[in-house]
Amino acid sequence: MTASYLPSIFVPLVGLIFPAITMASLFIYIEQDEIL
């Protein structure tokens, strides 16, 4: 029964967190590049 509603939670979670981590790491990389 767990597998029936697990993708409906897991997919939006990855869809929101993964781009957020990507944008955050890119922002930190740009900021460090400007400082150096």
Curated annotation (Swiss-Prot):
It is found in: Plastid, Chloroplast thylakoid membrane. One of its GO terms (biological process) is photosynthesis. It is a single-pass membrane protein. Keywords: Chloroplast, Membrane, Photosynthesis, Photosystem I, Plastid, Thylakoid, Transmembrane, Transmembrane helix. InterPro entries: PSI_PsaI, PSI_PsaI_sf. Pfam families: PSI_8 (PF00796). The chain crosses the membrane at residues 10-30. One of its GO terms (cellular component) is photosystem I. NCBIfam families: PRK11877.1 (NF008830), PS_I_psaI (TIGR03052). May help in the organization of the PsaL subunit. Belongs to the PsaI family. This is Photosystem I reaction center subunit VIII. The lineage of its organism: Eukaryota, Viridiplantae, Streptophyta, Embryophyta, Marchantiophyta. The gene is psaI.
